[in-house]
């Protein structure tokens, strides 16, 4: 999604009203329940949250010069910089070592890379299809990508073929290297 992204893709940049900020907070907590503990630390009442409208109907939400999350269609998706600050707040999957170089180049994640010995998926009941997940790698401390499940984790385990996760944002892509300043 962010293979080609620059300041030229920005159309408008406006301050968000406090009522909109409250609804965004509740939407974030609804989508990621574990964020409830840190949501007031993340977006304090007097924080100036900005919405940055970009091409391809992408909206970035930033505090100061840091993009915290973005929106394409309905769902809010955290940036990796935000995930690195609050890693325990998001659903996580783990890939094996062999898939790292492919994910870092923006490739979607295949099911065998999620079911091999170095990989890990959440225990039952698992995650539903279309869930936003943080992608960690075997023996690595920080997340390397944000993705969207193309099938449930139970289906990934049972089918074990095809694409399992669509990579939306990864280390080294244009959003990772993007600066608002």
UniProtKB/Swiss-Prot annotation:
Q: Which domain of life is it from?
A: Eukaryota
Record has RNA-binding as a keyword: yes
**SUBUNIT field:** Associates with ribosomal complexes.
Q: What does this protein do?
A: Involved in translation.
The entry's keywords: Cytoplasm, Protein biosynthesis, RNA-binding
Q: Which family does it belong to?
A: Belongs to the TMA20 family.
List the SMART domains hit by this protein, alphabetically.
Answer: PUA
State the name under which the record lists this protein: Translation machinery-associated protein 20
**Molecular function terms from GO:** RNA binding
Q: Name one Pfam family in it.
A: PUA
Its GO biological process annotations read: formation of translation preinitiation complex; nuclear-transcribed mRNA catabolic process, nonsense-mediated decay; ribosome biogenesis
Name any GO cellular component annotation.
Answer: cytosol
Its subcellular locations are: Cytoplasm
Species name: Eremothecium gossypii (strain ATCC 10895 / CBS 109.51 / FGSC 9923 / NRRL Y-1056)
Residues covered by the PUA domain? 90-172
